[in-house]
Design a protein with these regions (language model features):
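Rossmann-like adenosine-cofactor binding region
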Residues: 300-362
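Gly-rich Lys/Arg/Thr-decorated short loops/hinges at beta-loop-alpha junctions or inter-strand turns
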Residues: 99-102, 141-151, 166-178, 197-200, ...
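Adenosine-phosphate binding glycine-rich loop
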Residues: 227, 231-232, 343-436
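Glycine-rich phosphate/diphosphate-binding loop of Rossmann-like nucleotide-binding domains
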Residues: 147, 154-172, 224, 230, ...
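Short, often N-terminal, low-complexity regions
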Residues: 435-448
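Helix-enriched interaction subdomains in cytosolic or periplasmic regions
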Residues: 88-115
């Protein structure tokens, strides 16, 4: 499933209905239309740029032929704007200071920098003040679980890491540097991250396959004194919990008293179960074809269903993160259920089919995006200066996202032009019984809030 995006330059006669003919032709072959921009209006014609999305090269060819066959309409060019946008990469490292004189050089580099080095040597915490370390996150991947592409290697996964870095910068003013590791053994990844950790204020683990991701994150959280989070686990779980809170509010369902079923117990599924239990859901039931995954859920306090049918029959809320399109059958849907089929690009069941079968609420993964979570979570922990990201903090982040959602929406849209990204400070107190200490901190949680002009 390629999910190809192309931009068509289409010329139509300046007569009402011709744009509709083009849209109909695209829709008839299953293409999705994105942006439509008028490029030029001539004496008797209109030139438009039309962005379309299809699932395969064959479907793209069928779509192009359908547009070309329209009488009086000319398809001039077909371009890959996504590929063009990636030329040269999406991120860069630049100096914050201009160096235009000898005085500038002395302040920025030698000899002035020596005094700063000595100050940090005497008081290491001053590195957070006098360097970029305190506002810089490493995005670490081994390329074994890149989006829906699988084990394609770290270099092929670099565009994803650059995208994450760009979002960190634009949404939370956090510096983020992709770190590509050409190793696959957990102990090698752990040791490498430990070795480079002095240069960062936090570590975001990204697209590292299951089950290695669990060991890697747990070990790094134990052994490093900076916050570590695996986004495929906890970023996904935060936004999923926020979506469930919103869905329950709109339907009158008591989330904490509901039976929650999780189909698929990989990185995202296990973390989602743990997140719901941390929120206070009393009954969390999972299902996975892997005995090891099922055992992991039980070790965290969840239960395992004997079959998908049993889970569907008994659960009020069903979440699916399997990557298997059409896995959930319509006849399994129980009246009044909430269905969050979150796999991309195709869900386990289409929302329309779930609603038709009796679900009270249904959605797919297109609106449940990690971008609502990871930038603000790290902005929060970097501001607060905490060494660990706890479930208490993650639940607070999910609640902040849910509380900023407009009525009728599932979650906020972070890039809505009518919205601005703000931060709300929430005080978080939690007890670490293992260490027997009380830690009180401030967590700045990411949210998107309407500013009415």
């Amino acid at each position: 499933m390629n999910n190809l995006i192309r931009t068509l330059m289409v010329q139509t006669p300046t007569v009402p209905g011709n744009l509709g003919r083009v849209a109909t032709a695209i829709g008839n072959v299953g293409g999705d239309i994105g942006e439509v921009e008028t490029v030029k209006v001539g004496h008797n014609y209109t030139m438009r740029s039309i962005t379309v999305q299809v699932e395969s090269e064959d479907q793209l060819e069928e779509l192009l032929e359908a547009v070309r066959s329209l009488e009086g309409i000319t398809l001039h060019t077909v371009s890959d704007e996504v590929l063009h946008a990636h030329e040269g990469g999406k991120i860069q490292m630049k100096s914050k200071m201009k160096i235009e004189s000898i005085a500038d050089l002395r302040r920025v580099y030698t000899p002035g920098v020596a005094n700063v080095c000595r100050a940090i040597q005497e008081q290491p915490d001053k590195a957070k003040i006098y360097t970029s370390i305190g506002n810089t996150v490493a995005i670490v991947t081994d390329g074994t679980a890149i989006l829906g592409l699988g084990n394609i290697g770290p270099v092929a996964g670099m565009p994803v890491m650059e995208g994450k870095a760009a979002l960190f910068d634009q949404l939370a003013n956090v510096n983020a540097i992709p770190i590509l590791l050409n190793v696959n053994e957990p102990k090698e990844i752990i040791q490498t991250v430990k070795n480079i950790s002095p240069g960062f204020g936090g570590i975001l683990l990204e697209d590292i396959g299951s089950p290695h991701c669990f060991e890697i994150e747990e070990r790094l959280k134990e052994e490093l004194d900076i916050p570590v989070m695996h986004d495929d686990q906890h970023g996904t779980a935060v936004v999923t919990l926020a979506a469930a809170i919103s869905a329950c509010r709109s339907t009158g369902v008591n989330l904490k008293e509901a039976k929650v079923g999780q189909i698929g117990l990989g990185a995202a599924g296990i973390a989602t179960c743990r997140m719901f239990m941390a929120y206070g859901v009393k009954q969390v039931i999972g299902a996975d074809k892997s005995p090891e995954a099922n055992e992991r859920l039980v070790s965290y306090g969840g239960k395992v269903a004997d079959s998908l049918e049993e889970l569907m029959e008994n659960c009020d809320i069903v979440i699916a993160t399997t990557g298997v399109p059409g896995l959930i059958r319509k006849e399994w849907i129980r009246k009044g259920q909430i269905i969050l089929a979150l796999s991309n690009p195709k869900p386990e069941i289409e929302p329309e089919d779930a609603l038709e079968a009796g679900a009270i609420y249904a959605t797919d993964g297109r609106s449940v995006n990690n971008v609502l979570g990871f930038p603000g979570i790290f902005r929060g922990v970097l501001n607060a200066g905490v060494r660990d990201i706890t479930h208490t903090m993650l639940v607070a982040a999910a609640e902040a996202i849910a509380n900023s959602t407009r009525p009728g929406d599932l979650v906020p849209h972070p890039l809505n032009l009518k919205e601005r990204l703000l931060y709300t400070e929430r005080k978080t107190a939690f007890i670490d019984n293992k260490q027997g200490c009380l830690e009180i901190g401030s967590l700045v949680c990411f949210l998107s809030k309407i500013i009415r002009k």
